[in-house]
Design a protein with these regions (language model features):
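Nucleotide-activated chemistry modules centered on ATP-dependent adenylation/adenylyltransferase
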Residues: 1-30, 37-397, 405
Length: 405
């Protein structure tokens, strides 16, 4: 393969490098694991490295952390949960110092708590109001790493599945770090953390080569990487082969899709969600329909306040008056449609903890009855929320709020 890392290096040499870094100090490792091809490769290489060590040399803990934004594509969330369970079981079986964890945003700062509870407009396609990434993914992972630092009482090394070929922006950051000519680099935001990118030199083809050709595509924790290939292929509408021939005889590997949040409005089209649907996962159609509807109401003045949450009026560079958060009408409507979609799918799209957080936000900010949310939930699902009987009619009954719509 042209430009392959393995043209001049062997897999054994790569694992030896990882072993060298592991044994060089007593700093615990934290691996960011998304379930995608790159992070899976990192976890697989590290796991194999540990298996090759004598038990007495496995002298420090390795924490594998996955991030669940609570709005993950259901297929990806199910797969990731399965992999985390298998990893934990296999590590116990093999006596490895591996601990796996799944982090989520706190219920009162989740996507739905901010959109439905506080009325945050959904993130823009141009990225000017992309409030979600830090709250849903970066902060929960960062807080987890900080807890590891505090509990271990020492610095940590964070392993990432970043590669040179991934993007121009990432390439700039990687090459900038290489100027220091060392394997470990200071973490950009966490003071007592370093970063190690073990597969930085691997191409996409190299990654698939590791995943599919080593041990017949079986992971050390008992899964089959062909399942991962199927996920990528389905996300590409089922038309993505492992390696397809391009013009000039070059090959392009399957697996360039990214699995984002199913309700993400930063992109005009969710290619992976639509790809899954085209590949036969028609159970996801309600998600695509809800996402399209949510995008359609974002900039409709009927559903927006005139002022920002801090009471100021926003004007763009041309002096045009902008909108504030989603108004009460929009928030209640979004919740209704989300619950209806959840009923159709038979899959949890919003947790009870998030609903409780939204209930409390509405009570604090909107001067409305605590009964609004619990009665709406009962109307749509036919079930009572656990705190149904503990909230009182402090203001109006749910149906009496219609005068505000």
């Amino acid at each position: 393969m042209a430009n392959s890392y393995f043209n001049e290096n062997t897999l054994e040499e790569l694992i030896e490098e990882i072993k060298y870094v592991y044994k060089s100090d007593d700093r615990p490792w934290v691996i960011g694991y998304s379930g995608g091809k790159d992070s899976t490769t990192v976890v697989e290489l590290v796991y194999k490295m540990l298996l090759g060590l004598d038990p007495e040399d496995r002298h420090k803990n390795i924490y594998i952390v996955s991030s669940d934004t609570l709005i993950e594509n259901p297929l990806i969330k199910i797969y990731l949960s399965k992999m985390n369970d298998l990893l934990g079981q296999a590590a116990d079986r093999d006596g490895l110092p591996i601990k796996s964890a799944m982090v989520t945003p706190p219920p009162n700062n989740s996507f739905w708590a901010n959109v439905i509870g506080r009325g945050f407009p959904t993130p823009r396609m141009n990225g000017t109001f992309r409030w979600c990434t830090d709250r849903l993914k970066i902060n929960p992972s960062g807080e987890y790493i900080q807890r590891v630092i505090d509990e271990e009482g020492k610095e940590v090394v964070v392993l990432l599945g970043v590669r040179k070929a991934e993007s121009i922006a990432r390439k700039r950051r990687i090459e900038g770090r290489e100027l220091a000519n060392r394997l470990l680099n200071r973490h950009e935001t966490i003071q007592d953390a370093y970063v190690y990118n073990p597969i930085v030199e691997l191409t996409t083809d190299d990654v698939w080569d590791v995943l599919l050709r080593c041990d017949g595509g079986r992971t050390p924790w008992g899964s089959d990487n062909s399942e991962l290939v199927s996920l990528y292929a389905d996300a590409d509408s089922g038309e993505c082969p492992f390696a397809g021939i391009q013009a000039g005889g070059q090959t392009q590997s399957c697996g360039n899709s990214r699995f984002g949040c199913w309700v993400c409005t930063v992109v005009k089209e969710d290619k992976s969600l639509n790809g899954f649907i085209k590949s036969g996962h028609r159970e996801l159609i309600p998600l695509a329909e809800f996402r399209s509807w949510l995008m359609s109401i974002r900039d409709n003045e009927e559903y927006r306040e005139k002022k920002r949450r801090n009471g100021t009026v926003y004007r763009d560079k041309q002096g045009n008056m902008g909108f504030g958060p989603f108004n009460w009408k929009a928030r209640k409507l979004i919740l209704r449609k989300l619950l209806e979609t959840q009923q159709v799918m038979g899959y949890e799209l919003i947790t009870l903890d998030e609903l409780k957080a939204i209930d409390e936000i509405w009570d604090q900010e909107l001067d409305l009855s605590r009964r609004v949310l619990v009665e709406l939930y009962e109307e749509i699902t036919g079930e009572k929320l656990p705190w149904y009987d503990s909230v009182s009619y402090t203001h109006l009954r749910a149906h009496e709020t219609d005068q505000y719509l």
